[in-house]
Amino acid sequence: MENSERAEEMQENYQRNGTAEEQPKLRKEAVGSIEIFRFADGLDITLMILGILASLVNGACLPLMPLVLGEMSDNLISGCLVQTNTTNYQNCTQSQEKLNEDMTLLTLYYVGIGVAALIFGYIQISLWIITAARQTKRIRKQFFHSVLAQDIGWFDSCDIGELNTRMTDDIDKISDGIGDKIALLFQNMSTFSIGLAVGLVKGWKLTLVTLSTSPLIMASAAACSRMVISLTSKELSAYSKAGAVAEEVLSSIRTVIAFRAQEKELQRYTQNLKDAKDFGIKRTIASKVSLGAVYFFMNGTYGLAFWYGTSLILNGEPGYTIGTVLAVFFSVIHSSYCIGAAVPHFETFAIARGAAFHIFQVIDKKPSIDNFSTAGYKPESIEGTVEFKNVSFNYPSRPSIKILKGLNLRIKSGETVALVGLNGSGKSTVVQLLQRLYDPDDGFIMVDENDIRALNVRHYRDHIGVVSQEPVLFGTTISNNIKYGRDDVTDEEMERAAREANAYDFIMEFPNKFNTLVGEKGAQMSGGQKQRIAIARALVRNPKILILDEATSALDSESKSAVQAALEKASKGRTTIVVAHRLSTIRSADLIVTLKDGMLAEKGAHAELMAKRGLYYSLVMSQDIKKADEQMESMTYSTERKTNSLPLHSVKSIKSDFIDKAEESTQSKEISLPEVSLLKILKLNKPEWPFVVLGTLASVLNGTVHPVFSIIFAKIITMFGNNDKTTLKHDAEIYSMIFVILGVICFVSYFMQGLFYGRAGEILTMRLRHLAFKAMLYQDIAWFDEKENSTGGLTTILAIDIAQIQGATGSRIGVLTQNATNMGLSVIISFIYGWEMTFLILSIAPVLAVTGMIETAAMTGFANKDKQELKHAGKIATEALENIRTIVSLTREKAFEQMYEEMLQTQHRNTSKKAQIIGSCYAFSHAFIYFAYAAGFRFGAYLIQAGRMTPEGMFIVFTAIAYGAMAIGETLVLAPEYSKAKSGAAHLFALLEKKPNIDSRSQEGKKPDTCEGNLEFREVSFFYPCRPDVFILRGLSLSIERGKTVAFVGSSGCGKSTSVQLLQRLYDPVQGQVLFDGVDAKELNVQWLRSQIAIVPQEPVLFNCSIAENIAYGDNSRVVPLDEIKEAANAANIHSFIEGLPEKYNTQVGLKGAQLSGGQKQRLAIARALLQKPKILLLDEATSALDNDSEKVVQHALDKARTGRTCLVVTHRLSAIQNADLIVVLHNGKIKEQGTHQELLRNRDIYFKLVNAQSVQ
């Protein structure tokens, strides 16, 4: 009944969580335009103001051109065409001297405008890049700080993978949106405003008529922009979910590989990518439709302006000449063009605001327990008296399930108190409340008569040392891991703590001693070694309150007895709280507290509670512990009598070959990234060639618009050489209609670009993410052991590198094609109408090209550096968030924050140089056009005077080349994105071309019809590829007959778990063979081999899905029926628990199984293994996390499961393996003795002493 009540409460909670998650979607999901700059300091505000002013001045340069152009047109047309109405320009009434004077003045105007554009263009871009980098750095820092400051309850209900994606992808989008794009936005606004003012002053009637279409342009841009923001938010959300899956899978890769679940996880990842792809396609279409609508209305405006302008001239309106019409027209054109040019920048800014919404939400979240708080009382010393007063508690993520129900408990200073009870009774909850990871719902927790909520949280936690059941080590050296215990730990203190934790000896055996890297999550250390390093870390804190949560569970008997003694010694003078299933370790405790269903069932010393014959008595009896006689107890195994490891020369021949190879591969890996050309990147889009072709055709069509425009424009100017009003009116109507047609072409071609390139680009992004993730999943484990392939680094590649490849594909190719068509046609038309002038202008073009090349080269370098530093920063962030409980317990938040900041600082140092280069290149390419105009008009005037060119030809050449130059400028703006794309593609190709040594995808190798289960290790030597100087196995030889149960025992680091990994073929031996039924494992098909093996690991990994899906994970080759799932659950003694949950087998287990206790997770892992019905069963400490009742039942289930199977058991608990067919004692990677339990006891050697050390008969 109680189970079903709990179940109903859990169901309500899941429903509540689901609703809560959907709530924000109803609100606006973008921050305000000013709010996005909230992290700007005084200097940033100054830089932004100066940047804005420079943008406004730079923006004013363009509208000044029409004034000069109008003046010149009037001179040319009225002087040459209207008065003489002849094509013999030698006979112009206007004197050559006057024309020379005008052209010289015109040239000086253009040079002046060009100088202003050069100076202010440089200032605006460089200042905005600098301030954006400064603010982005602050946002990254503040976001990470805010996440670390959150209480643990918040982490229970949020997705770590999603947080990592936000930290990389979303903040990158903010950086893009608040940088140089803002400068360009203000420049366009300035051009628009001043252009408008010029137009109104020169001819207000024509300006107002021209402006009548502006509301339509703005309305269409605004509507599309709103749509883009909404779709971007949805797209980012889908990518965040995909990122969460990737993070979960990559951090649990050993489990994924063991159960051959690569394809299943790939599908789960790809499903989220499909959602993102669909939103991405819609976003691209909306963006291009917006652009198409703007250009449609603009061209319509041109037609209207010329038609109405011609009418005003023909009707004799005062002040209106062709020069006036041109000045007004170009002023409005530039204003309108700036609206179009501003749309992409506004869109980038809108995307940044959308991304900032989620980032700022986390930054503004006020935690209920602030890990960085300076408030609260800081007593000079803490005695360690602890009292729980009527404490009730439920986890915030499960508010309806009461874990503690009015707990009252007093612990005196210096006492050792043991908490015992079944799984789920509240033992670990008590420990977490004492650390103030959570606050109780009711009641008080007092330390030295102070409510712990009144104490400063950091100061208080500094007095607590914790050693947990699943110790967390960080991906750095042993030395750093121990020194994380507290600030300013000396080497002497570190070594003393290592000795006390019985870790010193094995550490000194490593070549690098305390500087040995432990690997990601301590992967290079055995369970026992990790546990002892964690104990050393706790002891170095010198805590007043010591919490031991199954602190010796991962240790072998020899280490356990030594560490137990060290812990007992460490407990002296400290308040010690012990959570243990092994009741033999707590008999000497001052007080034993038995918990049941969140309440205190009984308490007292061991003898008292045994006399009561209550719950504690029944727990002790179920463990069947009997005191060995005193003679046996005195025979402890001396660590000094350890057999020395093999002499070095016996393994020299192996080392010399393999270490060299390992070092060579490491060196080559550091330097080799494949060369990536544009063609190689484009080939990635090959399957979408129909979309690319159609998109390209649309781009070519769009590229023809401006060259055609230049011809029509020149025709309109020169048609005033004809005095026939009827002809003029007819021509004006025809040319105006052509402008409208050009507008329709623009709209259709932009829509087609969005439709086809959007699809091609998003499908490519999805495919590349899919391929990259697939390539990662099928690498061998040795690759994941490498430092640079941490989970954080790999998720950064998936999030950032691949998104950047779009900078050289999809719609970017559309822009390049459009610009290439524009430039090509412009040059051809220019040559036809005035080849001399065209030559002059084109001779200047290479300068622009060189500028672009410099910018591209510089940007590629900066992109690579930035990527590398952000990858390192991402690794630190991922590690911190995944192990947040440990970091909070150790109060190491500031240390991780500092490391993260150091990585950001390194990346930030590139910014100033980057700003100078990009600013200079932009300013030069932007201002160069004015200088080209100056030279061109001066030369054009000379050609007209010499009779080698007509004014019409000059206008066509100028307009065509101007649009061609704008196309070059637009292309140069894309250079940085192309650089990033090349850099991202290089990393992607390096990943895709990496061939694993053990290829799980390979179809090669034998697939025997049956697997008997005979195993053999034949002269196996092995070292981990990332530690080639430390041999783990040294010539191991052992035969295991089918159906037999063989147990591996020995001290931590002796090679037990390594043997298990070699059987799974996660690694290959360095020398020797691992044989299955007499066949070398290397000759067998990898997937077939792993399908014959199931493993129950020491630290079970569950996935963020339902219980049924987690059990079905045992066999990923088919859809497993529910009956089979229930059968496996029944065998693992967890079926009745699951049935009591509201959603039964559909209950979600949470991230890393967070909604379940350790024992429940372990039993699910056992069910998962049993479902596979394997021929070979590997049990690596399979019952370590279970309480006594569960252990008995599960042990019985495992004994039953072993029948007819070959079973390899790795354990420290010798009571569990007494019935094994063969017990193998490993020491320093070699077999020291083997036999049955009775035979080894008679030998009275290592095993005999291990048994006695455990005091188990």
UniProtKB/Swiss-Prot annotation:
<feature type="transmembrane region" description="Helical">
    <location>
        <begin position="181"/>
        <end position="201"/>
    </location>
</feature>
<feature type="transmembrane region" description="Helical">
    <location>
        <begin position="693"/>
        <end position="713"/>
    </location>
</feature>
<dbReference type="Pfam" id="PF00005">
    <property type="entry name" value="ABC_tran"/>
</dbReference>
<dbReference type="GO" id="GO:0005524">
    <property type="term" value="F:ATP binding"/>
</dbReference>
<dbReference type="InterPro" id="IPR039421">
    <property type="entry name" value="Type_1_exporter"/>
</dbReference>
<feature type="transmembrane region" description="Helical">
    <location>
        <begin position="737"/>
        <end position="757"/>
    </location>
</feature>
<feature type="glycosylation site" description="N-linked (GlcNAc...) asparagine">
    <location>
        <position position="423"/>
    </location>
</feature>
<keyword id="KW-1003">Cell membrane</keyword>
<dbReference type="GO" id="GO:0008559">
    <property type="term" value="F:ABC-type xenobiotic transporter activity"/>
</dbReference>
<dbReference type="GO" id="GO:0005886">
    <property type="term" value="C:plasma membrane"/>
</dbReference>
<feature type="glycosylation site" description="N-linked (GlcNAc...) asparagine">
    <location>
        <position position="390"/>
    </location>
</feature>
<keyword id="KW-0547">Nucleotide-binding</keyword>
<feature type="transmembrane region" description="Helical">
    <location>
        <begin position="954"/>
        <end position="974"/>
    </location>
</feature>
<comment type="similarity">
    <text>Belongs to the ABC transporter superfamily. ABCB family. Multidrug resistance exporter (TC 3.A.1.201) subfamily.</text>
</comment>
<feature type="glycosylation site" description="N-linked (GlcNAc...) asparagine">
    <location>
        <position position="91"/>
    </location>
</feature>
<feature type="binding site">
    <location>
        <begin position="1050"/>
        <end position="1057"/>
    </location>
    <ligand>
        <name>ATP</name>
    </ligand>
</feature>
<feature type="transmembrane region" description="Helical">
    <location>
        <begin position="110"/>
        <end position="130"/>
    </location>
</feature>
<feature type="glycosylation site" description="N-linked (GlcNAc...) asparagine">
    <location>
        <position position="17"/>
    </location>
</feature>
<dbReference type="GO" id="GO:0001654">
    <property type="term" value="P:eye development"/>
</dbReference>
<keyword id="KW-1278">Translocase</keyword>
<feature type="transmembrane region" description="Helical">
    <location>
        <begin position="827"/>
        <end position="847"/>
    </location>
</feature>
<keyword id="KW-0677">Repeat</keyword>
<feature type="binding site">
    <location>
        <begin position="421"/>
        <end position="428"/>
    </location>
    <ligand>
        <name>ATP</name>
    </ligand>
</feature>
<comment type="function">
    <text>Energy-dependent efflux transporter responsible for decreased drug accumulation in multidrug-resistant cells. Specifically present in limbal stem cells, where it plays a key role in corneal development and repair.</text>
</comment>
<dbReference type="InterPro" id="IPR003593">
    <property type="entry name" value="AAA+_ATPase"/>
</dbReference>
<dbReference type="InterPro" id="IPR011527">
    <property type="entry name" value="ABC1_TM_dom"/>
</dbReference>
<feature type="glycosylation site" description="N-linked (GlcNAc...) asparagine">
    <location>
        <position position="85"/>
    </location>
</feature>
<keyword id="KW-0221">Differentiation</keyword>
<dbReference type="GO" id="GO:0055085">
    <property type="term" value="P:transmembrane transport"/>
</dbReference>
<keyword id="KW-1133">Transmembrane helix</keyword>
<feature type="glycosylation site" description="N-linked (GlcNAc...) asparagine">
    <location>
        <position position="1104"/>
    </location>
</feature>
<feature type="region of interest" description="Disordered">
    <location>
        <begin position="1"/>
        <end position="24"/>
    </location>
</feature>
<feature type="transmembrane region" description="Helical">
    <location>
        <begin position="322"/>
        <end position="342"/>
    </location>
</feature>
<feature type="domain" description="ABC transporter 2">
    <location>
        <begin position="1015"/>
        <end position="1253"/>
    </location>
</feature>
<feature type="transmembrane region" description="Helical">
    <location>
        <begin position="294"/>
        <end position="314"/>
    </location>
</feature>
<keyword id="KW-0325">Glycoprotein</keyword>
<dbReference type="GO" id="GO:0042626">
    <property type="term" value="F:ATPase-coupled transmembrane transporter activity"/>
</dbReference>
<feature type="glycosylation site" description="N-linked (GlcNAc...) asparagine">
    <location>
        <position position="1188"/>
    </location>
</feature>
<dbReference type="GO" id="GO:0042391">
    <property type="term" value="P:regulation of membrane potential"/>
</dbReference>
<feature type="transmembrane region" description="Helical">
    <location>
        <begin position="49"/>
        <end position="69"/>
    </location>
</feature>
<keyword id="KW-0472">Membrane</keyword>
<feature type="domain" description="ABC transporter 1">
    <location>
        <begin position="386"/>
        <end position="622"/>
    </location>
</feature>
